Amino acid sequence: MAEPFFSVIVPAHNAADRIRKGLNSIKRQTFTDYELIVVCDDCQDKTAEIAHEYTQIVWEVGWHSCGRTRNKGLDLAEGQWILFMDDDDWWIEENAFQMIHDAILDGGEDFDVLAFGFHFGERGDAFQYHGKHYIAIWNKAWKREFLERIGARFPDVPHSDDVGFAEYTHPKARFRYLMAVLYDYNYMRPGSITHKLKTGELKRLEEMGLR
């Protein structure tokens, strides 16, 4: 069987109350040459059961580590390019994957990462991403061959594993940009660890002058 063009990796933790919106946004994509990988980390609810409604690639672990969970997704991935989605985020456009696919093909072979715009879900500000310095992994398509060649892995830390990943990958990567807002970053989910972490990421973004 030919490898899919995209592997979409979704790490999840007790996400039964929110994950459907993101999974539905993937299911609605007009471009269908992708595999969906959901890695459930210590889920005590029906997250895995819901994930099985959308994909056969559901892996359950008990690590309490988003970094290790994402690494498991990378281990399972067979796609040419990697996309990440948090369990409380979603894709805005139904043709998002098609737009990313077309931009990759138009770009030739001289880049490793395609970055695109994202939207802050609750604040209501559309933030157009123009540079490579924001640490997020979910507003980028990553060439799997590149990640494997440089041995890119997420650190096993309690939170902000994307910081270490960005510090390792960004200096080695060749970037290309798609000027379209495709991803909704729901950083304001109340009462959650994710909410606190994502608010911290917003502060780092503002400190770097990208906001």
Language-model region placement:
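Nucleotide-sugar donor-binding/catalytic module of glycosyltransferases
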Residues: 1-209
